[in-house]
């Protein structure tokens, strides 16, 4: 099966004038938001090639593996983008990163400038930090998270900052707005959708919103009059992340390798020379996983959902678990702290906690083991 990495390597000499920018190229843009461009990409434009080269020079292979626990092939993608005709003229700018354990924020975004001047605003999904996963849990009961507000404001600021262009021999000026797309994978897809939906007066400036296996929204978010005609969510056939919470956008199902949460990795998705390989329907495993997650958490009343999500966060804090990888490698001291915390809970809460930890560990194990090889 050809995947995204193969696609980039095999199409490296074919520029966009020969084979136009497509959904697979958009996924490349979405994945680039996971890269920590801090100190490399700032307000001014820098070429994608140069940014990739600088980034790879900062870290050893071992360091890159530890940074991208859930995106183990991302360093290979960055390497493949260093010297290509297809992506050589793409520029990066306006990288923004906000991280706070205290406020539970894990947010980053970067703007890509395509050769034709189009802008792609790419929002990052969840990294391997527990803070990022706490943020995901908050999405199940909160309608306006700090990361979502940051995404909305970033779009508003980007449109406001479009420079004026002179015409009539310089006597007059006006803004010429380029085509603009919003994209992101996982939570990043949710942020792209949120930023579009919460900027109704700016939707005319946005050509399309491409979410890649992005979750939906908490109960009560949708008001019924939103325009979702420009939003598409691409989800793998075993999808769980891209199906949870409330969705109204159109969905396209992709063929993919692996099973369960493994398919959340975009490098597991099947592509051909100019598009994804699509499926007619989702799998039974996807339906079963969704039913399990809904029974475990999503179908609970709002207040109960919020309380249970707080319990998970408190358990991880007490056990000093800071990354998802820590779940498979915690010490006896951490386990003891967890037991002490759990002993304070009632029987139903204890059962819930074990089910959540088991689900995360079982679904994450194939990814984490692969990343350590």
Q: Language model features by range: what are they?
A:
Residues 192-200:
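Short glycine-enriched nucleophile-adjacent loop
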Residues 92:
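Active-site-adjacent helix-turn-beta-strand microarchitecture at beta-sheet edges
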């Amino acid at each position: 099966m050809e995947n995204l990495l193969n696609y980039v390597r095999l199409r490296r000499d074919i520029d966009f004038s020969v084979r136009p920018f497509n959904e697979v190229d958009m996924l490349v843009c979405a994945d680039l938001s996971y890269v920590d461009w801090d100190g490399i990409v700032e307000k001014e434009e820098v070429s994608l090639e140069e940014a990739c080269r600088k980034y790879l020079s900062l870290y050893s292979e071992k360091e890159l593996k530890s940074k991208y626990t859930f995106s183990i092939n991302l360093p290979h993608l960055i390497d493949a983008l260093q010297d290509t005709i297809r992506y050589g003229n793409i520029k990066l700018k306006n990288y923004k990163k906000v991280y706070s354990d205290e406020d539970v924020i894990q947010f980053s975004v970067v703007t890509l400038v395509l050769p034709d001047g189009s802008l792609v605003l790419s929002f990052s999904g969840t990294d391997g930090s527990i803070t990022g996963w706490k943020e995901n849990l908050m999405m199940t009961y909160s309608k306006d998270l700090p990361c979502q507000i940051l995404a909305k404001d970033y779009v508003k600021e980007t449109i406001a900052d479009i420079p004026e262009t002179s015409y009539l021999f310089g006597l007059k000026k006006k803004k010429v707005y380029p085509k603009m797309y919003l994209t992101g994978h996982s939570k990043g897809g949710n942020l792209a959708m949120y930023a579009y939906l919460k900027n109704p007066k700016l939707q005319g400036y946005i050509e399309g919103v491409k979410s890649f296996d992005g979750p939906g929204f908490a109960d009560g978010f949708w008001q019924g009059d939103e325009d979702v005609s420009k939003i598409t969510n691409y989800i793998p056939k075993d999808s769980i992340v891209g199906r949870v919470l409330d969705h109204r956008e159109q969905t396209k199902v992709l063929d993919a390798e692996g099973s369960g949460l493994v398919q959340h990795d975009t490098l597991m998705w099947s592509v051909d020379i100019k598009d994804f390989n699509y499926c007619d329907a989702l799998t039974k495993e996807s339906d079963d996983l969704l039913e399990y997650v809904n029974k475990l958490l999503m179908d609970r009343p709002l207040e109960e959902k919020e309380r249970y999500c707080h319990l998970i966060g408190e358990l991880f804090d007490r056990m000093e678990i800071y990354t998802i990888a820590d779940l498979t490698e915690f010490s006896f001291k951490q386990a003891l702290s967890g037991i002490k915390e759990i002993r304070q809970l009632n029987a139903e809460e204890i059962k819930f906690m074990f089910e959540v930890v088991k689900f995360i560990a079982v679904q994450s194990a194939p990814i984490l083991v692969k990343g350590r090889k």
